[in-house]
Amino acid sequence: MLWFVAVCFAIASVSAMSPADVKKHTVESMKAVPVGRDKAQNGIDFYKFFFTHHKDLRKFFKGAENFGADDVQKSKRFEKQGTALLLAVHVLANVYDNQAVFHGFVRELMNRHEKRGVDPKLWKIFFDDVWVPFLESKGAKLSGDAKAAWKELNKNFNSEAQHQLEKLGLPHA
């Protein structure tokens, strides 16, 4: 029986990814979508992908509920919003090994989204179901470790997001 417990513990400790490893793998995969003065197209491309692959979520973008990829491409709003989103994801990946800063930034993101009526379940799926497929559409070759790192970041992000939503008195999952 003792050997069984030892094996289970060994497997659990091997499968857990350290914050430093999560940071390493997520930051590496972000090379497919850099930020910079001449990189706004990466943020626009995110919203083109998002509006094409997740049409049901356009309802959260007042005035753009019927936008398609061409509309997003021409929109100053989505140029700015895309740059902001891209920067936010870069920050989350780059500070992941500093959990106090990571959690503080997640709370700030929830504060900024407080009045937007975003379904709290969306925070649970964002990185797994939206961000990772977007990265792959941009040519990122994500290893199993990279996908596991994004899954871990997503889990931690969602946990803190739900905590903050509850604190704000908003619906939470």
Curated annotation (Swiss-Prot):
Q: Which tissues show it?
A: Expressed only by adult nematodes in the gut.
Coiled-coil region list: none
The molecular function GO annotations come to:
heme binding; iron ion binding; oxygen binding; oxygen carrier activity
Q: Which SUPFAM superfamilies match?
A: Globin-like
UniProt KW Membrane keyword: no
Heme: present as a keyword of the record?
Answer: yes
Signal peptide as annotated in the record:
1-16
Name the positions where heme b binds. 113
Task: Identify the Pfam families for this entry.
Answer: Globin (PF00042)
**Which positions fall inside the Globin domain?**
17-166
An example Gene Ontology cellular component term from the record? extracellular region
Listed A to Z, the keywords are: Heme, Iron, Metal-binding, Oxygen transport, Secreted, Signal, Transport
> Where is the major localization of this protein?
secreted
Give the subcellular location.
Secreted, Extracellular space
Family in the record: Belongs to the globin family.
Q: What else is known?
A: The globins of the nematode parasite N.brasiliensis have oxygen affinities 100-fold higher than the rodent host's hemoglobins. Two isoforms are found, one located in the cuticle, and the other in the body of the nematode.
User: What is this protein's record name?
Assistant: Globin, cuticular isoform
Which organism's genome codes for this protein? Answer: Nippostrongylus brasiliensis
